[in-house]
């Protein structure tokens, strides 16, 4: 590996404050360019998500409409920040974005949203957060920084989980490719059940697989 002497992206816009971080890059055949979804804002934990494009992966053009994804003030679980997204390649006309949301106490959960073009009209999952800790769990204070792999049977999602003492790597598994979004034009139903992160839509098998 040969590192470049200077960063390929720096914060220079008002919303970016002092930080650009958590890059997630896809090569887009239709656009014939790289697209980067990135987080920006304060140090350590960013505030919102932006997008940029590049032909060579070095020189990036930030979108004039950034940030493209910001906290929803009507949803307490993500009222503080949204950041550290993982965007799956387009499938059946949709980009699916797994993202970190933080509440007013900076407790982190994983949410899911989708968009036709990967930039505009993001539709949040009606049962967000789709993966959340609960009192007494090994990952109660934070589930974040998802990394997602599509398999023959559905999805595997690895994440950072923490409980203010340890930070560990967890795994969530989803059977099938129907992620539970409502049909277009419908509002959908919140299926979170008892609010523990283990009911209804949270049909993920969660487990700790590594400690570091």
Model-predicted segments: where are they?
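Carbohydrate-active catalytic/glycan-binding domains of CAZyme proteins
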Residues: 1-212
């Amino acid at each position: 590996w040969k590192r470049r002497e200077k960063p390929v992206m720096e914060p220079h816009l008002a919303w970016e404050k002092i930080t650009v971080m958590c890059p997630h890059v896809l090569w887009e055949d239709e656009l014939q360019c790289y697209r980067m979804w990135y987080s920006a804002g304060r140090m350590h934990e960013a505030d919102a998500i932006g997008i940029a494009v590049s032909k060579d992966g070095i020189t990036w053009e930030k979108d004039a409409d950034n940030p493209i994804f910001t906290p929803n003030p009507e949803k307490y679980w993500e009222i503080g920040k949204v950041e550290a997204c993982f965007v799956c390649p387009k499938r059946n006309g949709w980009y699916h974005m797994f993202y970190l949301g933080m509440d007013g106490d900076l407790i982190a959960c994983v949410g899911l949203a989708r968009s036709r073009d990967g930039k505009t009209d993001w539709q949040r999952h009606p049962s967000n957060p789709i993966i959340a800790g609960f009192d007494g769990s090994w990952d109660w204070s934070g589930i974040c920084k998802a990394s997602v792999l599509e398999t023959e049977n559905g999805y595997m999602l690895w994440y950072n989980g923490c409980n203010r003492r340890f930070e560990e790597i967890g795994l969530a598994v989803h059977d099938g490719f129907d992620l539970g979004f409502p049909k277009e034009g419908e509002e959908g139903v919140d299926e979170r059940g008892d609010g523990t992160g283990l009911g209804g839509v949270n049909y993920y098998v969660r487990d700790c697989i590594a400690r570091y």
